[in-house]
Amino acid sequence: MSDTTTLTIEALFQRVESIFLRAGLNAVQSGALARVITAGERDACKSHGIYRIEGALRTVKAAKVKPDAIPEVAEDDGTAIVKVNAMGGFANPAFELGLPALAERAKRLGLAALVINDCTHFSALWPEVEGLTSNGLAGLVMCPSYSTVAPTGGTKPLLGTNPFAFGWPRKDTSPYVFDFATSVAARGEIELHRRARKSLPEGWAVDADGNPTTDPEAALAGAMLPFGGHKGSAIGTMIELLAGIMIGDLTSPEVLDYLGTTTLAPFHGELIVAFSPEAFAKGRPGDPFQRAEVLFEAIIGQGARLPSGRRFAARAKSESEGITLTAAEMAGLDRLLEKGLDAVS
């Protein structure tokens, strides 16, 4: 008997979507969640793949997210801001709903922003970024989380892991994309270390007393650290301001107060900013996309690689060969499909 199973991307999507439908989520929520989770597995981004299903279901079971939510786009007020209310559901369907209006407005005005309010967000941000680059737009995406990161010089959780992503469209090749937490590592990475009973690298976290630790359990009970010391701390604070306070949504401390735990997916807002390179470069010499390629080629020419290169390579492999899951992963999917919300506590 094989220890692995290989599925097509579509087959995995259907299986994941069925799990969410079985758990009582409507088609709008289930489809969007299944797309982003399948994309994570497709790109070998395991910390944002099927691993995330249980957390999403726990959040539904705890009644902290509405499984039947239908997101709504606010009436066009003539500004560059598109607003979508997730209506207490997940962020992913809200983004899918708002993307066409965001892209149209950014191309017409040169710059536009999508504000998503009242949403639960558990996924990576590169799917949003790639939604922009596929429309020929550059983009910035950010959101808070819940308090799990100590500010530089502090010892207690205050900031969120506060992910931040950027994308630049490229012709006839994969876009330039980076997506990272403003903590040293994503919280999901610490969870994966805990599950694998592996020690953390030094400098990732402190324990509940503020002492450095490499124990994942102690780290989860303590605080993570920002990347780059005071620089990461400042960027994390900026995200609290822009994607929390400025858009009238929750900051990471407020999210933690609302949830009362870090075991559920966080409830907050999300900010997506789209730029038209042609509009910004209009009237200036040179094509912005060609000039960008000169920069990218210079980076590669030094033996460096562009961010997300491994993810895009994994995507190409999955598209040609399928997605391979272990026996344990397949059993986990079967259990979730059979039991629905009863599979999580």
Swiss-Prot record:
GO terms for molecular function: oxidoreductase activity. Substrate binds at residues 52, 161, 187-188. Pfam families: Ldh_2. The active site is at 47 (charge relay system), 48 (proton donor), 189 (charge relay system). It catalyses: L-proline + NAD(+) = 1-pyrroline-2-carboxylate + NADH + H(+); L-proline + NADP(+) = 1-pyrroline-2-carboxylate + NADPH + H(+). NADP(+) binds at residues 121-125, 179-181, 230-231, 305-311. Induction: Is up-regulated when the bacterium is grown on t4LHyp or t3LHyp as sole carbon source. SUPFAM superfamilies: L-sulfolactate dehydrogenase-like. InterPro entries: Mal/L-sulf/L-lact_DH-like_ah, Mal/L-sulf/L-lact_DH-like_NADP, Mal/L-sulfo/L-lacto_DH-like_sf, Malate/L-lactate_DH-like. Keywords: NADP, Oxidoreductase. It is an enzyme of class 1 (oxidoreductase). Its EC number is 1.5.1.49. Belongs to the LDH2/MDH2 oxidoreductase family. Homodimer. Catalyzes the reduction of Delta(1)-pyrroline-2-carboxylate (Pyr2C) to L-proline, using NADPH as the electron donor. Is likely involved in a degradation pathway that converts trans-3-hydroxy-L-proline (t3LHyp) to L-proline, which would allow A.tumefaciens to grow on t3LHyp as a sole carbon source. This is Delta(1)-pyrroline-2-carboxylate reductase.
